[in-house]
């Protein structure tokens, strides 16, 4: 079992591990238990009663949080013609086609999000070994393979987050920074909760949300009642 440092243990004393906190209480406590020497990310972790091995239970998607994430994203777009122009106008940090493919092949990875038009995916596919392990491959489910590249860029710049259930049935997603007001964190939490509830597979059995917790970077987990997330 990993040993925790003094600052973590001091933060953990503020959390009652035997109780469930309301959303508002949890957001305030996540801020209070943030002890990093930078503006920590507040993250939520859902443990879902799904089997990701089943195709119809692979929960994945994206949403624009009402108050953003507090993080500035660098966005690159693979597009040609009018879509390339639209991506530039929308604020993409880099736009290209074969030239951008070559640039990435030569080591360029200074970006957080990759967007592509459907026609460009054959070319982007050549970058699978580079982008795939970093979770950067464009995907229609997250709105990053689209003809409306301008909207996709705007969404990313506005604070879009992706969520995806892993092999253990867990979803981890950021909902803001420790510097956010607690009510803004709560609004972001509510938005993510709503899409996860709507994404429940028809074939999922039993209690859908088994547990949910929020925490600041390096901070202790703060548990909420999975049956009462209002």
Curated annotation (Swiss-Prot):
Function (record text): Binds directly to 23S rRNA. The L1 stalk is quite mobile in the ribosome, and is involved in E site tRNA release. Protein L1 is also a translational repressor protein, it controls the translation of the L11 operon by binding to its mRNA.
Assembly behavior: Part of the 50S ribosomal subunit.
Keywords assigned by UniProt, alphabetized: Repressor, Ribonucleoprotein, Ribosomal protein, RNA-binding, rRNA-binding, Translation regulation, tRNA-binding
GO CC, alphabetical: large ribosomal subunit
Entry protein name: Large ribosomal subunit protein uL1
Alphabetical GO biological process terms: regulation of translation; translation
Lineage: Bacteria, Bacillati, Bacillota, Bacilli, Lactobacillales
Family (UniProt): Belongs to the universal ribosomal protein uL1 family.
SUPFAM superfamilies to which the protein is assigned, alphabetical: Ribosomal protein L1
NCBIfam families for this protein: rplA_bact (TIGR01169)
CDD domains for the chain: Ribosomal_L1
The gene coding this protein: rplA
UniProt superkingdom: Bacteria
MF terms (GO), sorted A to Z: rRNA binding; structural constituent of ribosome; tRNA binding
Gene3D superfamilies reported for this sequence: 3.30.190.20, 3.40.50.790
InterPro entries recorded: Ribosom_uL1_bac-type (IPR005878), Ribosomal_uL1 (IPR002143), Ribosomal_uL1-like (IPR023674), Ribosomal_uL1/biogenesis (IPR028364), Ribosomal_uL1_3-a/b-sand (IPR016095), Ribosomal_uL1_CS (IPR023673)
HAMAP family according to UniProt: Ribosomal_uL1_B (MF_01318_B)
Pfam families linked: Ribosomal_L1
């Amino acid at each position: 079992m990993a040993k925790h440092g003094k600052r973590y243990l001091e933060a953990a004393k503020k959390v009652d591990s035997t109780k469930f906190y309301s959303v508002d209480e949890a957001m305030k406590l996540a801020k209070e238990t943030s002890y990093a020497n930078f503006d920590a990310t507040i993250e939520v972790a859902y443990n879902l009663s799904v089997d990701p091995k089943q195709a119809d239970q692979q929960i994945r998607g994206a949403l624009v949080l009402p108050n953003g994430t507090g993080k500035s994203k660098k966005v690159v777009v693979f597009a040609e013609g009018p879509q390339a122009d639209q991506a530039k106008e929308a604020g993409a940090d880099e736009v290209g086609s074969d030239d951008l493919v070559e640039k990435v092949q030569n080591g360029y990875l200074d970006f957080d999000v990759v967007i592509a038009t459907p026609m460009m995916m054959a070319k982007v596919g050549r970058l699978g070994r580079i982008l795939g392990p970093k979770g950067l491959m464009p995907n229609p489910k997250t709105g990053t393979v689209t003809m409306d590249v301008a909207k996709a860029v705007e969404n990313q710049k506005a604070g879009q987050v992706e969520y995806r259930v892993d092999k253990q049935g867990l979803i981890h997603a950021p909902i803001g920074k420790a510097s956010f007001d607690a009510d803004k964190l709560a609004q972001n939490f509510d938005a993510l909760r709503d899409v996860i509830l709507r994404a429940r597979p028809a074939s999922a059995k039993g209690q859908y949300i088994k547990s949910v917790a929020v925490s600041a970077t390096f901070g202790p987990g703060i548990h909420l009642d999975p049956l009462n997330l209002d």
